Amino acid sequence: MGRSYIVVGGGLAGLMAAIKLAEAGQRVRLFSLVPVRRSHSVCAQGGINGAVNTKGEGDSAWEHFDDTIYGGDFLANQTPVKAMCEAAPDIIYMLARMGVPFNRTPEGNIDFRRLGGASYSRTAFAGSTTGQQILYALDEQVRRFEAEGRIEKLEHWEMLSVVKDGEGRCAGIVAQHLKSMRIGDFRADAVILATGGIGYIYRRSTNSVINTGSAHAAVYRQGASYANAEFIQIHPTAIPGDDKLRLMSESARGEGGRIWVYRDGKPWYFLEDKYPAYGNLVPRDIATREIFHVCYDLKLGIGGENMVYLDLSHLPAERLQERLGGIVGMYEKFVGDDPRKVPMKIFPAMHYSMGGLWVDFDQMTNIPGLFACGECDYQYHGANRLGANSLLSAIYGGMVAGPKAMAYAEAQRTPAGELAESWFAAERGRQEAEQRQLYAMDGPENAYRLHVEMSDRMVEHVTVVRTNAGLRQTDDFLQELQERWRRIGIDDRSTEHNRTVPFVRQLRNMIELARVITLSALNRNESRGAHYKPEFPERDDANWLKTTIATRTPDGPVLRYEDVDLQFIAPRQRRYDVSKAKGAVASGS
């Protein structure tokens, strides 16, 4: 019997992994919560990094690698990051051949812009809808393989758990069809998770509401390790709103946008004043903390509210339309002001998780046969992600995971199709029993209200500025929520298209993952990248230059630590008030 594979997640990482397997002649089933083209990758705006150096600035894969390690405050393992940066130019050219309509220079070359934390212009972009254009291009390739019978899409399916054989190896998944509510088991010789971010753990973020992290938590509950959970990226520029927060891409600053507030009656460009070498293109963690300082400490937010200006009005309207038309139109639609004429009002928002499932350099988790790639793994960004590295890491992670999953599967003696039915029936039965319990829940608590309470508390204590007292209170509160979750009442018992029952299950998983994030942050007594504690304001390499790894126990997460791979670049002080080279000299003197 031949080998078969399952990919869970229809964003960039999942599509790329499926494509690599199909290219090798393998059979792949691709599961997605939503139609593939509605995956959250479609929301990415700014671009994808690669040191192509068509502008002759002196960029190289090494410079990209150094910027990424430096920007991540030296917490990323260097071997996979170096390989990713070396592969990046070819990935961009591959996407162009697939039909991604990257902006071009007058000479016909792919155009590149500079984003935060980058020393050079290395971000290829398709206006301000790069994620959408790449997602659609990859989906066209997947559809070709569908027509050839090598990929089968199963949309509107949610993975509930993995199936493990008697030796603890992943042999498939149990999933639920969200229309019929049917639960089924599916065999695979290897499973690749590409299930995206965890933004819905926070009340309002730039993420889609499907980004619950529930799949991460499901396999964490089954023994998968979770790494660097404490590193949550807060994007400095989002459009405030009552329902959700809409990202205002870093490309707005890459094209010349300036952040400012009034001070003493005059515009104060505070990032340019404090960080003259990078100005408005400092990394996201730094820009976010400065905006918080201006609004909360200096009380200089617009009209006394927590907002600052992001100004594009000094730039030519034609250029804005050509290069930023998508986000300019979005702001005008949702706010009613024209950014070509008046400054935009923005404020930071939860955006991305640098942490994720622990994987080795082959993208495999500690559960044999279970791989992870994209935002759901922890591998490429350290303590802070640079803009436009997310699309790159998603695609590159998928390119690695596909072939490595195939190599793993082919090395196994017994194909999943020949394993005993009992393993699959037992796990399916466990999930069906759990579903019956969910339907029977008849307590006084409301699941959606519990989610609001949890996500508000996470925003308050586990985002930009963290204190140990606040983190302890948050963990105590999350444990209370776990008890209150047991007293939820289900108000919808329909057996088709039921949205409440899956949400209650997802909420349990979100609370579980929120505890991992909170306790990982509580334990790390230093400030590094996106993790900032005023009580411990400096980076502490002697004690904390290490990866946090969480393992689940019945009493909660147990944390251990793993050394970081530092074989290429020695850690140095991270500064953005001077150029990177000068900062390196200053820290070594």
Segments predicted by a language model, with ranges:
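Core beta-strand elements of the Rossmann-like FAD/NAD(P) dinucleotide-binding domain
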Residues: G2-R3, M181-A190, N366
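Conserved N-terminal glycine-rich FAD pyrophosphate-binding loop of Rossmann-like flavoproteins
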Residues: V34-D67, L247
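Glycine-rich Rossmann-fold phosphate-binding loop(s) that bind the pyrophosphate
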Residues: G9-L12
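Glycine-rich loop(s) and the adjacent beta-strand/alpha-helix scaffold that form part
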Residues: A190-L245, I302, N384-K404
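Glycine- and aromatic-enriched mobile tails/lids
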Residues: M1-S4, A17-K20, A24-Q26, L30, ...
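Short beta-strand to alpha-helix junction loop
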Residues: A76-E86, A124-D139, L154, S205-G213, ...
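Conserved redox-cofactor binding core of oxidoreductases
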Residues: A96-R182, R187, A194, H235-P240
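An anion/pyrophosphate-binding glycine-rich loop and adjacent beta-alpha core
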Residues: A218, A224-D337, K404-E410
